[in-house]
């Protein structure tokens, strides 16, 4: 269905995954972080400002949109979160900005063959 390195979470796996996410988000919220659930893909020009350009073809999934728009699936919620303030000038008194992002992340993990170590399996969506 999803090909190599795709998976389903089922039953208690779903419950455990959601419990861990909820615990983490609750912890961050109590520490004063603003919770953010960003979009799963962003425009190419924004992605170019938030990641290393070498990541584009090697690690990121491209999404074909309108004729004039290219989008990329996010590899981390930090990419769209950092872009939220891309045209702002921040005053020192307004810092630090503290965000807790929750999202699925998407990476090709190209060349990841043989890199599964210590029980961690590289997958395309996590």
Predicted segment positions?
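TRNA-recognition modules of translation machinery and tRNA-sensing kinases, especially anticodon-binding
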Residues: 1-126
């Amino acid at each position: 269905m999803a090909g190599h390195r795709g998976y389903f979470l089922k039953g208690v796996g779903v419950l455990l995954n959601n419990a861990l996410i909820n615990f983490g988000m609750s912890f961050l919220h109590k520490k004063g972080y603003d919770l953010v659930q960003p979009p799963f893909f962003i425009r190419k020009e924004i992605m170019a400002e938030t990641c290393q350009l070498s990541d584009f073809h090697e690690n990121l999934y491209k999404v074909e949109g309108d004729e004039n728009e290219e989008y990329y699936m996010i590899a981390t919620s930090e990419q769209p979160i950092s872009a939220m303030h891309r045209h702002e000038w921040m005053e020192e008194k307004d810092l630090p900005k503290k965000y807790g992002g929750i999202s699925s992340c998407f990476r090709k993990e190209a060349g990841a063959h043989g890199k599964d170590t210590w029980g961690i399996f590289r997958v395309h969506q996590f």
